[in-house]
Amino acid sequence: MQNPFTTTFSKTPEYTYIHTEKTEEILENFIYDNPSESVYKITGVRGSGKTVILAKVEEELRTNESRYINWLVFDVNPARDILGQIGAMLVKAGFGSQDKKTTGIDEVSKSEEMVKFASEYGRWLRAGYPVYFVCTGLYENIQELSNVKNLTFFRRAATVKTEPLNMIRMTEMYKSKLDIDSDEAREMAKITKGYAYAFQELGVLCFKKKAGESLKDILMNI
């Protein structure tokens, strides 16, 4: 049987994804013809699920066409020419003037490419183009970029802070996917402290545990 848990960075778990209110907060805004928020900054400590939220938002906008109409999603590499990447993707997509265009960037920081993109994006917003931007980053990196001169829009943009995963949902997921009792599943959920990465990593290890190996044995080897 395939391991339902994954520790692959930036990959949305197919079988063990736990929905969060933060994800829905962003997606709910994008349902409307003219979303009230154009920019979201997803921030939190390492391992708290920032990238998973971004990946889920991008996935929903791309695939749920009945709910999100005329959306184009560009997932770009912040270490390369961001504007060049977006231009190439626009040409390939054959976009129309009514298409809403969302750029997703994981782990932003104050780099030359990011400042250049953000400055241009601010011009697009002022011109009234249907452009949207969702990014993730550590708090200090988000703050450093926010303090760049003339990036007022980014400084004032909606900030989404990651929160611990729901204890009950984690317990239920562990119980069903690992075929264990409620007490052990609850203990595992507590150990993760709600961190998305810890939830997946502990799930991976317990799925692969040997016969007779206990949770205590697994934790001693971490």
Identify what each model region corresponds to.
Residues 1-38:
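A short, basic N-terminal segment
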Residues 36-56:
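Walker A/P-loop nucleotide-binding motif
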Residues 39-41, 59-78:
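Conserved catalytic segments around the Walker B and adjacent sensor/switch elements
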Residues 55-56, 60, 201:
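Active-site signature of alpha/beta-hydrolase-fold catalytic machinery across serine-
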Residues 98-140, 147-150:
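Conserved Walker B catalytic segment
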Residues 157-185, 191:
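Conserved small helical "lid"/interfacial subdomain of P-loop NTPases
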Residues 186-191, 197-211:
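C-terminal helical "lid" of AAA+/P-loop NTPase domains
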Residues 206-222:
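Conserved C-terminal helix/linker of AAA+ ATPases
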